[in-house]
Structure formats: structure tokens, C-alpha cells
Amino acid sequence: MRKETALKQAQPGFMKRFGFYIALAVLAVIVLLPTPEGLSVAGHRMIGVMVFSVIVWATTAISYPVSAGVIMVLIALLVGFAPNEATGRLYGTSAGLGMALKGFSSTAFCLVAAAMFLAAAMTKTGLDKRIALMILSKVGAKANRVLLGVILCGFILSFFVPSTTARVACLVPIVMGMIKAFGVPLKSRFAGMLMITVAQVDSVWNVGIKTAAAQNMVAVNFISQTLGVDISWLDWFVAAAPFAVLMSAALYKLMLHIMPPEIDEIAGGQATVTRLLKEMGKISADELKLLVISLCLLFFWTTEKVLHSIDTSTSTMVAITLLMLPKIGVMHWNETVNKINWGTVVLFGVGISLGSALLSTKAATWLANQIVSIFALESSTTLMVLAIMTVFLIVIHMGFASATGLASAIIPIIISVLQQLKTPGVNVVGMTMILQYVVSFGFILPVNAPQNMIAYGTDTFEVNDFVKSGIPLTLIAFALIMLLGATYWKWMGLV
């Protein structure tokens, strides 16, 4: 562990120590203020809960699972004791708790939970590691080709490992093993280039593939719930893949320019990867079974609405059931349950509940009206709206360590903002999907995403190295959003 990290843990910052109490104080102030005109009491209180959530998530003053529990209680009590304008009576804590638990009954929640099991199966069998090593064994020993291999690993794994942190957790030990086997210093530009790329390419392909990240499921759920449109895996891929491919190419060029490796070719590099692959032995029966089930699942994802009507969540649940069955499966409940990050699952469910409550109490609509008014968006062109909202999301993400939390708080408001626009021909579904891509832009700081922190923990680069890659990468991403918004996405009818 880094000395800096250990020091920070020993002496947490002011917001880390007092963020929870500040969040409670801000919540109390908001709730005690007079309810604004056009906003219900329940909506007023939900804005307070949302601000509380943003503060505790941004400061990580309390852990995400604990914050999820606190948010559930706040929704149950504050909404429960608010008057229901439709009936003239209080909502009641039972109805409030129902709002707090709504996210746990969504199909998106089932998909995220199932994805955790799929990621655990990949880790248990070692199939993800084998895939990564096979790719790296084919690219050669030149420094630039090793970098290309890391990018290809991130791309391929995003299809099969539907967990951001699981993909990075798979790649980091492999890349670290390669760095040590190559005899390259940990603080070399080559080592830093590879490890930063591991994190950044993961964020890039979070955009490209619907099932690659939990925050995508947040947006898909709200689009379905609010707008009645179900976005298939293929719909998402066709729209987002060009962006991710162009970003991957930009990442490759950028990393070679910013952190040019000290060596052109690694002596014995190819032999090292081959040795690591040989140490794994022949592909096991469990790996084969998982590979077949994963390929079948990928087939069902890509052909949804084309060859069949089975949605992504249902097909994933079927796959997980097969993986848990005797003889057919590759894992047992007792050994798998402890490998699942249940905190992430709970946070996701509560995030959906928070957004749903903002929508049902009309708090999101009221906030949207304020945003439209402040930024004069009502009659702006779609590209201007896209530019302003993209910059807004990039800036606000600087304070977040969880893209899932950011999506939960902001996507309902974005949908409401887009619904308020009077610009003719605005595609609310398409614009929401594109702005969800921006939610995954955790490129600038290590603390902006869990995958960044995993890579940072290897001690192969400094914060300023990450920032040097993150700022230009973010600017390129913004430029691509605007370019595709004016061309490809416009031709598709998304903008």
C-alpha cells in the first residue's frame, strides 16, 4: 500500500470525518425551509434526501452500503410523514418504505445482481485471466503492442465480465506480473502507462457496452420506467460502440505520447506471457462450461428484439441459474455468496429507489424546471443542450467516486429537463442515453472511479500522471460527444 494512502487513512480529511454530519445539517435546513411554490411537501423532502445522498456519496463519509440503509430510512420517514396531495392524508411510513424498496423489484436490479455472480464465476474458474493472457500472447513484445494488448483485453473482457471492478481486478495482477517479469521498474513510464490504461480503457468500454457497468442499468431502468422504452443490448451497442472504438484509439495514441515507454521492445516479453499461460494448464471443464454459457448469453443479448423477445435481465438470470446447477454449473452457493460485493448490489437498489421517488413525488420535474430556467435551455438547440449538460455532468462527476450513485441522482433530473424543452424534434430517450455515456467519464482523478483506485494502489504512477492522461482524454471525449451528436447520432435519430 502507498505511504500516501496509509497516511490518508490515518488522518482522514475534514469532509471524510464530518461529511455525514454536514449532510444531516443540510438535509435539516432544506426540510425546514418553506416548500417552494409548485413543489409538493414530499417532493421538497426528497430533494433534501437527494442532496444528503450526494454529500455522503461525494465525501465517502460513510460506506456506500451504510449510506444505502440511511437513505432508505430517510425516504420511509420523511415521505411517510408528508401529506399526500391526492388524498389529503399522510403517505404513511408503509408507503414511504415501499418507495425506499422500489428499486429492489426492478429488472435492472436483477441484472446487476446476476452480473455479480457471472463475474464471480469468471474469477473462480480463471477464464477471465486465460482470455487476457491469450490476447497478450498474440500481440508481441514491443512496448506499443503490449499497450494495444491491454486495450484489447479491456475491450474483450467487457463483453464477458459485467463488472467494472472485476475486470480491472483481473487485469491488474496480470499486468503487474508482466511488469515484474520484464524487470521493468515499478515507477517507470512503461509500467505507469500500462496501469493507467487498464483503468481508462475500462471506463471507455463502460460506455460501449450496456452490460459492462451498473450505472448503465440505472439509466436503462429510468428510461423504461419513465418513457416506456426498453433499450436492447444491441440498440445500446450500435449507438455507443463507435464512440468507444474512437476513444480506444485516442487512448492508445495519447498514452504513447504522454508516457512514452523507455524501451521499444521487452526482452523475453513474449516468453513471459507464454509461461504464465502455460502455468494455467489446459482449459478446465469448468472453464469450458462457463465459456459456452457466456457465449450463449452474449448471443441472446445481441439478438434481443431481433430473433427473440427475451430481455437482457431474464436471459442473464437463466445463465446464472445454469451456472449454479449441479453437474452443469461451475460454482456452489456457499462458496460464491462470500465473493459477491453485496454492498454494490444494495447501493444499486437504493439508487433506483431514490431516482424513482424523485420522479413519483415530482421533485425531479421541479428541479428540471429550475435547471431549464437557469441555463436558458427551453428553446436551445439540441446540440447546445447536449454541450451544456455534458459539461455539467463532467464537472459534477469530479466530486463523485460512484458512477452508480451519480446516475441514480442525476438521470431522473436529466429526463425531466429534456421533457421540459420546447425545441422541436428532441429525442428524450436518445439524449438521455447519450448523457448516460458521460456519467461514465471518470477519467480525470483516481478517486473518480473504483477501477482508478485499484490501478492507483499498484504504486506504478502518481496522481499527476493520471491527471495528465485524464484531462486530454476528457476533452477528446467531449469533442467526440459533440461530433457524433452532430453526425452519427443525428443520423440515427437519437439527437
Description of each model-found segment:
Residues L27-I30, I47-W57, M72-F81, L111-F117, ...:
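Central hydrophobic cores of alpha-helical transmembrane segments in multi-pass inner-membrane proteins
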Residues P36-H44, V51-V70, K253-H257, I283-L288, ...:
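Flexible hinge motifs at transmembrane-helix junctions and intramembrane kinks/re-entrant loops
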Residues V112, N144-S158, V184-N206, I231-W236, ...:
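Alpha-helical transmembrane segments of multi-pass membrane proteins
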Residues F18, I22-V29, G48-I55, V70, ...:
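Lipid-exposed faces of alpha-helical membrane segments in multi-pass integral membrane proteins
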Residues L39-G48, S105-A114, R167, D311-I320, ...:
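Structural signature of hydrophobic alpha-helical transmembrane segments
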Residues F14-A23, V41-M46, T59-A68, G98-M116, ...:
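Helical membrane-embedded segments and adjacent short helical loop/helix-boundary regions
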Residues K8, T35, V66, V70-P185, ...:
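Membrane-embedded alpha-helical segments and adjacent helix-loop junctions characteristic
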Residues R2-P34, K124-L127, T164-R167, V184-K282, ...:
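Juxtamembrane and boundary regions of transmembrane helices in multi-pass small-molecule transporters
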